Design a protein with these regions (language model features):
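Active-site-proximal structural scaffolding
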Residues: 13-14, 111, 128, 132, ...
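Extracytoplasmic
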Residues: 15-17, 49, 212-214, 246-247, ...
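Active-site-proximal cofactor/substrate-binding loop regions of enzyme domains
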Residues: 132-134, 138-140, 158-169, 174-189
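Long, His/Glu/Asp-enriched segments that create or flank divalent metal/ion-associated functional microenvironments
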Residues: 259-264, 268-279
Length: 280
């Protein structure tokens, strides 16, 4: 994926002129979005190679009090792309969601003995929420967050079997395991991409591209979707916290992907989370 372009990089520095030449094979395609950017542009195509040029002049000097939402920037993304042997297109969010789903296909199988263990844990429970709660708490008690990303591992999850054996995984791996556990319980759920971080800006919803850095699990219910932060050992099911709340996320399915938004939490509606820790 492509880096964004920020023509202003430092505080108290005058930018008299800055330009970007972006050269790419024409058949890959290019999507872009100019944000607060008034640039002179030029496009040239020669022998199947396209060069797009943006040039800005006499930009405002940044100070510490500068409104970051007014910062000029250029967002870039390919239409066609490949990572490893997996090719995809980002004409729309559905295309990116389908690519992510294909990337993780076949990596959720659980051994028969563990499937039986799951069924035993939920055999006396009546409602889907009760089953979600028990399995989520099992995940929180027995697995820990460790991020190891080799090769395509920055995008593709570890297998559920590997997480079971190692007792750890990153956000992708823990989410994939939780999804697989719920599937055994007969509860559908969706691997969901999000740009996480406290007080982070929302993604650009009109530029379908990989703007994400984290994964959560979304579980549809009759009363609305439940979000599971599978790297947390404390959150109750359905509570995401300010790390991923109130922002657009990409829900992925084998048929494609679609955007939805995580809940916003108002201070006067907050619940307390009380924990008791014994250290010996």
């Amino acid at each position: 994926y492509y880096s964004d372009w920020y023509p202003i990089n430092y505080l108290h520095q005058k930018v008299t002129k800055s330009s970007l030449d972006f050269v790419y094979p024409t058949d890959l395609g290019l999507k872009f979005k100019e944000v607060n950017l008034e640039a002179k542009t030029k496009t040239e195509v020669t022998d199947g190679i396209t060069t797009n040029t943006w040039q800005v002049e006499d930009l405002e000097v940044l100070t510490p009090s500068y409104d970051q939402e007014k910062l000029p920037k250029l967002l870039l993304a390919p239409v066609k792309f490949s990572i490893g042997e997996f090719q995809g297109e980002m004409n729309d969010w559905a295309g990116l969601g389908m690519w992510q789903s294909k990337l993780n296909a076949g990596r959720g199988q659980l051994p028969e003995d563990f499937q039986q263990q799951i069924l035993q844990m939920i055999q006396d429970l009546d409602t889907p929420y009760e089953k979600i709660e028990v399995l989520y708490e099992y995940l929180q008690r027995n697995f820990r967050y460790v991020s190891i990303q080799l090769g395509i591992g920055g995008w593709q999850t570890m297998t559920a079997q590997e997480v079971l054996e190692n007792k750890y995984g990153d956000c992708k791996a823990l989410t994939n395991l939780m999804k697989s556990m719920l599937e055994v319980a007969g509860i559908p759920s969706f691997y969901t991409l999000v740009y996480a971080g406290v007080d982070e800006e929302d993604i650009e919803v009109d530029l379908p591209s990989n703007q994400f850095n984290h994964v959560i699990l979304q579980v549809p219910t009759d009363s609305g979707p439940i979000g599971l932060e599978c790297t947390s050992t404390l959150n109750p099911p359905g509570y995401l916290g300010d790390f991923t709340s109130n922002r657009h996320v990409l829900v992925t399915t084998p048929e494609g992907g679609y955007l939805t938004k995580t809940p916003a939490y108002q201070e006067d509606h907050w619940n307390k989370i009380l924990t008791e820790t014994n250290v010996t």
